[in-house]
Each structure stands twice: as structure tokens, then as C-alpha cells.
């Protein structure tokens, strides 16, 4: 982002529940990062994702599963992007995107959580109320249980 593009009311893009990190590695396009996509890369193309940064399209499966699948395949991070063909079906011209239609403009970025909840509600209090003084699992507990990603993920426009 250029400094001139910043705005005090702009919410910077992030994926909730991923750890903060600065990583470097080779970038690999992994389609939707489904298990079958990653299997095809490994089996058909001999691609090992260990130490790689995966670039995945939004869609088909939950973003948290994309991150978990890449993590399980040995990746060190994930970049998630919206394919204009999926989110701007009429084209990306101003008259074809929000606020004139329901479709995401090119400057739009999907945001959301990447945790895979053990149960509905607050991930740190699965199965019981999230009230003051209630017992809570730690982020480390949630990572050990597979509910929170261990690798960073970043959405882009």
C-alpha cells in the first residue's frame, strides 16, 4: 500500500487468529488449497511445500481450512486472494461493483477468522460461557489442539 492510499478509517487487511510473523520463502500457487489441490501438487508435479509460502484463492472451502492444509503440508505462510472471476461477475468497472452492485471492487479485501473452532462461540471458552472470570484455554492450548493456525496468513486484494 502506498502512503497516499492510507486513510485513518481504513481497516487494514488481516486474518484473525493467525500469528504475527515476518517470513521469506518461495511463493507457490495452490489453487483453493484443498487437500486434493495440495495432493495434486505433490503427486503429479513433485512439489514439496515445506518452507514455501502458499498463495490460495478464496472459495470452495473455509479460509481456516486452507491455512491448516498448507500448514500440514509444511508451508510457512499463506497469502489469500479474491479472484475477480469469483467476486466481480459483471466485471471490475466501477458501475459493476459495490456500491452500484453487490460485487467486490478491485480495492476490496476479504477479511475473517482462520481459527477452526472446537465448538461454536469464543474459541478460548469452547462449550462454556465466555464471561468474566471464566476458565479460558490459552492460545498455546488452542494451537496444540489444532484450533488456531501456527503459520501466518495474509489476505490481499
Predicted regions and their residues:
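Generic recognition of flexible, low-complexity loop/linker segments
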Residues: 16-17, 41-44, 65-68, 140-141, ...
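N-terminal leader/propeptide and maturation segments of large enzyme subunits in energy/redox metabolism
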Residues: 121, 126-156
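Solvent-exposed, acidic/flexible segments
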Residues: 56, 60-63, 149, 153-154
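Noncatalytic luminal/extracellular "stalk/propeptide" segments of secretory-pathway proteins
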Residues: 1-53, 58-60, 82-85, 96-129
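Protein/peptide-recognition domains central to ubiquitin and immune signaling
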Residues: 1-3, 64-67, 80, 89-99, ...
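Non-catalytic positions within long, well-ordered alpha-helices that form the structural scaffold/packing
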Residues: 71-74
Amino acid at each position: 500500500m502506498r502512503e497516499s492510499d492510507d486513510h485513518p478509517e481504513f481497516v487494514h487487511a488481516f486474518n484473525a487468529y493467525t500469528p504475527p510473523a515476518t517470513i521469506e520463502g518461495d511463493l507457490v500457487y495452490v489453487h483453493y488449497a484443498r487437500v486434493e489441490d495440495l495432493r495434486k501438487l505433490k503427486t503429479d508435479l513433485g512439489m514439496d511445500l515445506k518452507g514455501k509460502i502458499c498463495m490460495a484463492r478464496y472459495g470452495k472451502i473455509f479460509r481456516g481450512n486452507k491455512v491448516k492444509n498448507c500448514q500440514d503440508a509444511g508451508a510457512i505462510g499463506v497469502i489469500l486472494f479474491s479472484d475477480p472471476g469469483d467476486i466481480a461477475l459483471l466485471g471490475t468497472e466501477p458501475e459493476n461493483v459495490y456500491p452500484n452492485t453487490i460485487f467486490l471492487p478491485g480495492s476490496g479485501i476479504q477479511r475473517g477468522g482462520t481459527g477452526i473452532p472446537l465448538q461454536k462461540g469464543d474459541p478460548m471458552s469452547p462449550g462454556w460461557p465466555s464471561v468474566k472470570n471464566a476458565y479460558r484455554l490459552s492460545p498455546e492450548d488452542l494451537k496444540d489442539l489444532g484450533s488456531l493456525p501456527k503459520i501466518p496468513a495474509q489476505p490481499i486484494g
